[in-house]
Amino acid sequence: MARTKATARKTVPAQQEAHGYEFGGPIGASLISFGLPIACYAFGFLCNDVSGCPPPSLLSPSKLFTPPTLSNKVPWQHALDTLAAEVGWPGWSGLINTEAVLGVFFWYGLSLLLWVLLPAHEVEGTELRTGGRLKYRFNACLSAVTIFVACAAGTIVRGPDFQVWTFINRNYIQLLTVNIIIAYALAIYVYLKSFEVKAGNTEQRELAAGGHSGHILYDWYMGRELNPRITIPFIGEVDIKSFMELRPGMIGWVLLDLAFAAKQYKSYGYITDSMRKWTPLLLGIHVLTIHPVIVIISQSVYVFDALYMEPAILTTMDLTTDGFGFMLSFGDLVWVPFIYSIQAKYLSVHPVALGPLYVALILTIQATGYYIFRATNNDKNIFRTNPNDPKVAHLKYIETGTGSRLLTTGWWGTARHINYLGDWLMSWSYCLPTLAAGYKLTPTILFENSRLVSTDGMKGAGIPITYFYMLYFAILLIHRERRDEAKCRRKYGAHWEKYCQIVRWRILPGVY
């Protein structure tokens, strides 16, 4: 996607904002950079279809470290061997295979082809510090619809044995590994390319304010270049950040959910109400045990809202402030699809029937969260693009020295980041369907390679896994709010202080 010239002013060096370390500085960035893959593998293995979620031996540490009487193993070796067996450890060489590599590269290639071939909206981004605006091509929603229509057709023909679903379930850990490698490689690539950015360049390339501290690992994590782009033969110029923000990972998140739903159906012959995330569309052709509640609107609503509102990312912190480094690369390609789908993975092995009352409660939470999330963001987007629109013309605001307007009434008069409240409430509906999570699997002779699922002694043991998203997301949103507050305080100065006196609450009115 070419950079616009019509709106570009003469590119001049921009004055850099004072910017301190974030995320714990170089030490924090280092720990996060090498700790995140470990966390992803931990979630992938600890909630499994071999022994349980979590592995039962973890609930009895004394037994775990006590070898049998005739064993010549030391305690730690016995513990490692036991855990390896219980989590289905494939060995180091088994963490990756050719099938997964080819599948992932096909997925990224398909995403690029749909981006360039399907009709798209071409819009300009916000004005850069150095002047001018970049052009963006948006068709993520149409791309997703194309993909899911194809998957629906395949599922109608093949049912839960549709090749996409079986491929994902057969290679889950290997797919995780390949995406981790791509995330690291991409972060290294954009870091090295960022040193080509020169002050006063005519290509509208600029460094992120917080991404060139001089500390290699910290800058690699935060991202040195604000909007790195790459020219691919037969594809053209691709904005790496905006492309990775929604396509491979967000659409992949829903694909993982659907694959896990297919796995549950193949294993049990039905899909419980707790798993109703698009599954009626794709698997409804088969005979199902349908519960009173038809659909729990959850993760797919969030994803398709983001895809439909794709141009709105142009004014987010990710696009306007953060560089593209390991933080966004790993988050977009690995963390979002593989961690956010953990509840569906859990339910694929341990079906949970919620019942009408619990379904109604979760639907209410989801609907409330979505209403707050969408209403607040709509007000903000409309006000930014057309402040005279009748929907927002009555709202009061403070005008800053930079020309920006800060809303002080309506939704945005209740809290400075009220949209985060809706975002967090929606996260509840992803986790609550797992109830008091925890199960174990016991081999049975009824069928070959079959296991019985039970919750005996396991109820609640899986909560740290299936409810992790709620806690993590709360921390993420509070941390993001603090970062945004610091940025706005630097940018708006006294006007921001005045704004905070009028709009006192940060996220939750009356509480925080």
UniProtKB/Swiss-Prot annotation:
InterPro entries: ERG24_DHCR-like (IPR001171), Sterol_reductase_CS (IPR018083). The keyword Membrane applies. One of its GO terms (molecular function) is NADP binding. Pathway: Steroid biosynthesis; zymosterol biosynthesis; zymosterol from lanosterol: step 2/6. One of its GO terms (cellular component) is endoplasmic reticulum membrane. It is an enzyme of class 1 (oxidoreductase). NADP(+) binds at K380, R384, L407, W412, N419, Y420, D484, C488, R489, R490, K491, Y492, Y499. It holds the Pfam family ERG4_ERG24. It is a multi-pass membrane protein. It is found in: Membrane. GO terms for biological process: ergosterol biosynthetic process. The chain crosses the membrane at residues 27-47, 100-120, 140-160, 172-192, 242-262, 278-298, 324-344, 353-373, 418-438, 458-478. It comes from the Eukaryota. The keyword Cytoplasm does not apply. Its main location: membrane. It catalyses: 4,4-dimethyl-5alpha-cholesta-8,24-dien-3beta-ol + NADP(+) = 4,4-dimethyl-5alpha-cholesta-8,14,24-trien-3beta-ol + NADPH + H(+). PANTHER family: DELTA(14)-STEROL REDUCTASE, DELTA(14)-STEROL REDUCTASE TM7SF2. Belongs to the ERG4/ERG24 family. This is Delta(14)-sterol reductase. It comes from Septoria lycopersici. The gene is ERG3.
